[in-house]
Amino acid sequence: MAILGLGTDIAEIERIEKALGRTGEPFAKRILSEDEVIKFAELKQKGRYLAKRFAVKEAASKALGTGIAKGVTFHDFTVSNDEFGKPILTLSGVAKQIAESMGVNHVHLSISDERHYAVATVIFES
């Protein structure tokens, strides 16, 4: 197995919370997939959740080498968790097509947050 792509992103939670406060749910829906929007609606710390998902999607788009451009959108990435809480990143749409063309067979995701920041790292592996 070889590393085909690596991306890291850090998001300031307060900045995301302010944007969410200004624009509300439309801002969240611009970033989150349908499954993530359902979970988002149930949470108390919405800004923290959104900041972590934003960081993941930016990191994943960097690992693809495209950023959020060239047909790749935030909705092409969905974060869920396995039965142990491990984060799982699922690709769809153009992001999935690009990853397949790169030969990606394994996706690794790490997410962490502290008081002020959320950070994510994504590795695409053959």
UniProtKB/Swiss-Prot annotation:
Location(s) in or outside the cell: Cytoplasm
Major localisation: cytoplasm
EC number: 2.7.8.7
Superkingdom, taxonomy of origin: Bacteria
Pfam families: ACPS (PF01648)
UniProt-listed GO biological process terms: fatty acid biosynthetic process
Disulfide topology: none
GO function term, MF aspect, one: holo-[acyl-carrier-protein] synthase activity
Keywords: Cytoplasm, Fatty acid biosynthesis, Fatty acid metabolism, Lipid biosynthesis, Lipid metabolism, Magnesium, Metal-binding, Transferase
Enzyme class (EC, first level): transferase
GO cellular component term of the entry, any: cytoplasm
Keyword DNA repair: no
Reaction(s) catalysed by this chain's protein: apo-[ACP] + CoA = holo-[ACP] + adenosine 3',5'-bisphosphate + H(+)
Residues binding Mg(2+): 9, 58
InterPro entries in the record: 4-PPantetheinyl_Trfase_dom, 4-PPantetheinyl_Trfase_dom_sf, ACPS, Ppantetheine-prot_Trfase_dom
Gene3D superfamilies: 4'-phosphopantetheinyl transferase domain
The protein's required cofactors: Mg(2+)
Family: Belongs to the P-Pant transferase superfamily. AcpS family.
Function summary: Transfers the 4'-phosphopantetheine moiety from coenzyme A to a Ser of acyl-carrier-protein.
HAMAP family per UniProt: AcpS
Protein name: Holo-[acyl-carrier-protein] synthase
Originating species: Vibrio campbellii (strain ATCC BAA-1116)
